[in-house]
Regions:
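N-terminal secretory signal peptides that target proteins for export/translocation
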Residues: 1-4
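Cyclophilin-like peptidyl-prolyl cis-trans isomerases
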Residues: 22-433
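Bacterial N-terminal signal peptides
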Residues: 6-16
């Protein structure tokens, strides 16, 4: 072998060794520590890290890694795994369907969705429907990738979230898509007030922006003179996402909640996200007040993983000006005296008589469409501490999960499906356990 060939082979060997030494291994995703729980529960089976498959060019991704968790979430929510082989993919349906192209869209577009025509030959129509069932706009004979700003006029000036429904003939198809304009809420106007039959004071909300909550209240006129004008509202973009209900499984039965992004978009999205990601699992209803001091139906409150009434998600939400009335079955955010202090704790109203005074003071963001027996059963839980509303045995929230919402129908307000109570104040609710 010539000296030239020997030198070339030696240099090649040195280059390969150096290249291998400088290539870091892909670190394995750590298994998270189990979260602390307020009550003793059986320890879960430890997660077994899969062994490395030496036939692969990359390490096997651990089953608990963020990559796999996100893939499974998308599979559950969209009913299709984009990374699965073509032969094993599960179709959403054989009929027509639609999906958002992305979650966030810029204010001037494109605002796109993907429409699958399906097997039927009849043309498809898109309807933009508000919460009252009024059709705000429509586009006919649509399919493929559609820019909504080009086919539905007025969508760029939406003030509240609306629902995009796919229709074939006279039949709505599948789950609607929420079209939510991203707007900052107007500044909240407050004053110090005294609670009825008490000397205690609290922060009372009296208006939003330049609009008072009670235009007939003469005391607000002086307050309005001190209000500093906020920035004019603008649309910073859009959120587009599949409409989902939240199924709350408790040891008293199930409660199905329809969200109201048209009233409180950020609050509804926060609750949906915490529910989807398991924040509420194994928490409970730590405060049960079936009736207030005047005997009027009041609230059941939950959403605190510590079950103390002081826990939360580690952040606070800006209060939103929801006008959804606090009626039986309506879900709203609990908070401290500071208006922008809500996080994860929520409550269900038990009756208009006792909770009408909460309108405008607390942010209602949805309503139960099934589960009145469970709500009434929780409200009938024996109380150990009446002053605090502390139950003797805290009703447990086993899990929460997202389920696809039903189609939106023109001319129909889904709030008509809100649950009705099965009992009267003072009666014992029939348990659904």
């Amino acid at each position: 072998m010539s000296n030239t060939i020997q030198i070339a082979l030696l240099l090649t060997f040195v280059f390969v060794v150096n290249a291998q030494a400088q290539s870091p291994e892909i670190p394995a995703s750590p298994i998270p520590e189990p979260a602390a729980v307020p009550t003793a529960r059986p320890a879960a089976n430890p997660v077994q890290r899969p062994e490395r498959d030496t036939t692969r060019t990359r390490p096997v991704v651990p089953a608990d890694s963020p990559e796999v968790t996100e893939r499974l979430r998308r599979f559950r929510e969209n009913t299709i795994d984009p990374n699965a082989p073509q032969s094993t993919r599960v179709p959403v349906t054989k009929s027509a369907s639609m999906r958002p192209a992305r979650l966030y869209c810029p204010p001037h577009g494109p605002l796109e969705i993907n429409i699958r025509r399906g097997d039927a030959g009849e043309s498809l129509t898109l309807m933009l429907i508000d919460r009252n069932g009024e059709v705000l706009g429509m586009a006919k004979d649509v399919q493929g990738r559609v820019n909504l700003l080009e086919v539905i006029s007025g969508i760029d000036s939406l003030e509240h979230a609306a629902w995009l429904q796919l229709v074939q003939g006279d039949h709505p198809l599948g789950t609607p898509i929420v079209i939510q304009p991203i707007r900052e809420p107007p500044p909240v106007r407050t004053t110090r007030a005294t609670r009825p039959n008490s000397t205690a004071t609290f922060t009372k909300i009296i208006g939003w922006g330049d609009r008072p909550l009670d235009a007939d209240d003469p005391t607000i006129d002086e307050e309005r003179k001190t209000w500093i004008a906020g920035d004019p509202p603008i649309i910073s973009g859009f959120k587009t996402y599949t409409d989902m209900d939240v199924l709350i499984r408790t040891d008293h039965g199930e409660i199905l909640v329809a969200l109201a992004p048209d009233e409180a978009p950020s609050t509804a999205w926060n609750f949906r996200t915490l529910a989807r990601d398991g924040f509420y699992d194994q928490s409970g209803f730590h405060r049960v007040v079936p009736a207030d001091r005047e005997g009027k139906p009041f609230v059941i409150q939950g959403g605190d993983p510590t079950l103390t009434g002081n826990g939360g998600p580690g952040f606070a939400l800006a209060l939103e000006p929801s006008t959804l009335p606090h009626e039986y079955g309506v879900i709203s955010m609990a908070r401290a005296d500071e208006p922008h202090s809500a996080g994860s704790q929520f409550f269900f109203a038990l009756g208009r008589e006792g909770t009408a005074r909460l309108d405008g003071q607390y942010c209602s963001f949805g309503y139960a469409v099934s589960g009145s027996r469970a709500v009434d059963s929780i409200a009938a839980t024996p109380i150990a501490d009446i002053a605090e509303g502390r139950p003797a045995n805290i009703p447990v929230i086993l899990t929460m999960q997202l389920v696809t919402a039903p189609a939106r129908m023109p001319g129909i307000d889904r709030r008509q499906d809100r649950i009705k109570t099965t009992t009267k104040v003072g009666e014992v609710a029939p348990t659904s356990r």
